[in-house]
Amino acid sequence: MASISRILPTDGRLSQCRINTSWVPSTTRTQTHLDFPKLVSVSNSGISLRIQNSKPISPVFALEATSSRRVVCKAAAGVSGDLPESTPKELSQYEKIIELLTTLFPLWVILGTLVGIFKPSLVTWLETDLFTLGLGFLMLSMGLTLTFEDFRRCLRNPWTVGVGFLAQYMIKPILGFLIAMTLKLSAPLATGLILVSCCPGGQASNVATYISKGNVALSVLMTTCSTIGAIIMTPLLTKLLAGQLVPVDAAGLALSTFQVVLVPTIIGVLANEFFPKFTSKIITVTPLIGVILTTLLCASPIGQVADVLKTQGAQLILPVALLHAAAFAIGYWISKFSFGESTSRTISIECGMQSSALGFLLAQKHFTNPLVAVPSAVSVVCMALGGSGLAVFWRNLPIPADDKDDFKE
């Protein structure tokens, strides 16, 4: 669902707008009310604002962005005059459908789970090779939404992105190990739980962040960074934490992660950077494909381990649900020490939502015991339902008006 995040509105940013100066008494007054006086030019025909990658402007403008980054500029309280009202062009019918399908993601997961358990033959055709292609396409679609500038933004936000990265690869793996040892899971099930806890952030986290009123741009950056880091962190942590339980082929895990995750992402970024006209055409269809593929990648693991789930699924629900719930909570409260509410929600969701599909694929390819893959299959359901439930809960809690902005464009 990485490509789906392209249609989700991110934080408003002003690209360019022109304002009639008839309501502005003087240049001095204008500069008093603007956060960026050096970027304002005044002429007889009006005030020109030209900003690139600037922070949101406040309190003079209320910004509202759509997928094509159209912006509405409105006069704020305390500034007199009549600024003509305008409204952004509405989403197309296709974009509305994609947004609806995306926000109903938990429903598709539930339906996919039921199909996987009771009619597994409908989804088990998506075996290892096809599963690999599907996951690779999702990584490619995420890359198609990124540019070199997005990686420069990571460098401008080292602390914010870094905390999310550490939460992803420190809090979650330790939680997975402690839960597996405390509940005394069998070696293959414990290994599977540790493996999925060491996987990078899931693409569905971008959608959950959008629903929760978090910072979608930051969510995409964190998912990207953890995805790139997975080539080293996932095999290294799995070997470190689960190596004493079962043999772990760290080199094989690294190679598979590189092939399935990193290569498609890099190809997508390069294509978007050097062939933007071509990718702009492709990107119109990738969201719909992303919705379908993500649903299949959630349903297929359930179908492939349906027999095991019917006999041992109950004993896995508690540890997997506990893993995600604890990650959501710890990620949020640690973030609250340094960041505002919006950023804390974003880091919490990133910490709690893993790429369970990647965990399932790695378990199938590199572990002989089929039980190792079962925790990842259960995680697909727990992660989607827990993350979306938390997002809906937060959506009904307003972000404080004085919430600090921790994200630098």
UniProtKB/Swiss-Prot annotation:
Superkingdom assignment: Eukaryota
Q: Name one GO molecular function term.
A: pyruvate transmembrane transporter activity
Transmembrane ranges, per UniProt, are: 97-117, 128-148, 161-181, 185-205, 216-236, 250-270, 282-302, 314-334, 374-394
Where is the signal peptide, in residue numbers? none
**What Pfam families has UniProt attached to this entry?**
SBF (PF01758)
An example Gene Ontology cellular component term from the record? membrane
> What job does this protein perform?
Sodium-coupled metabolite transporter that plays a crucial role in pyruvate transport across the chloroplast envelope. Is required for sodium-coupled pyruvate import into plastids.
Do you know which NCBIfam families this protein is assigned to?
bass
Stated family = Belongs to the bile acid:sodium symporter (BASS) (TC 2.A.28) family.
Name the record gives this protein: Sodium/pyruvate cotransporter BASS2, chloroplastic
Q: What is the lineage of its organism?
A: Eukaryota, Viridiplantae, Streptophyta, Embryophyta, Tracheophyta
